Regions:
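C-terminal motif of bacterial Sec signal peptides marking the signal peptidase cleavage site
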Residues: 28-29
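Protease-labile, long low-complexity intrinsically disordered regions enriched in Pro/Ser/Thr
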Residues: 34-181
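Short intrinsically disordered, low-complexity segments
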Residues: 6-10, 23, 32
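Bacterial N-terminal signal peptides that target proteins for export
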Residues: 2-17
């Protein structure tokens, strides 16, 4: 007995084989353990409001500091910390990502409220709670200078301060003005 395949049958077999191989690869890739980031503590000046950033891999930056197994990022009054540290990649548990205000040299106040949306409502303008908004990694790239700068950025303030962009500034302008790239 001879089995013959027509061209449409052959294409179906190849397509199914490709789909099976792709699915197998995807499942294998997704089954790897997810890289966990180190704990991070961001310490801001007492009354700081606005955008703040950590720019990584800066030779003239601050060396990485640790406190109780957590990376310490002390944000200066201009809102931008330059650090020699490499960016920590991976996922981080919410309880390992903490934000503080330095009220006195000995006293930190933790900011626990996170605002996850920027919906502009009348209620937002009535809320006087201090929030951390946004956050996440970014990369500034300059192809002419062959330069990539990794950073993390956030905002701190009441909802109205965040919506009104109080002390908001563009990190790209900061990088260019300070010739970091």
């Amino acid at each position: 007995m001879t089995t013959t395949f027509t061209l449409p049958d052959f294409k179906s077999i190849v397509l199914c084989s490709f789909a099976t191989a792709l699915l197998s690869y995807s499942l294998t890739a997704c089954s790897d353990t997810v890289q966990q980031r180190e704990a991070e503590h961001y310490i801001l000046p007492a009354n700081y409001v606005g955008a703040f950033y950590v720019i990584f891999d800066q030779a003239s930056g601050e060396p990485l500091q640790y406190q109780a197994d957590a990376r310490q990022y002390r944000i200066p009054t201009n809102g931008v910390l330059l650090t020699q540290a490499r960016i920590s990649e991976g996922v981080i548990a919410a309880d390992k990502l903490r934000f503080f205000r330095q009220d006195t040299p000995e006293q930190l106040t933790e900011i626990t409220a996170r605002w996850l949306t920027s919906i502009d409502t009348a209620q937002a303008y009535q809320d006087n709670t201090t929030y951390i908004f946004g956050g996440g990694p970014g990369v500034y790239s300059n192809s002419e200078l062959k330069c990539d700068i990794h950073f993390r950025g956030f905002h701190i303030g009441t909802k109205s301060q965040i919506l009104d962009e109080v002390n908001h500034f563009d990190i790209e302008s900061f990088i260019q003005q300070n010739k970091l790239c």
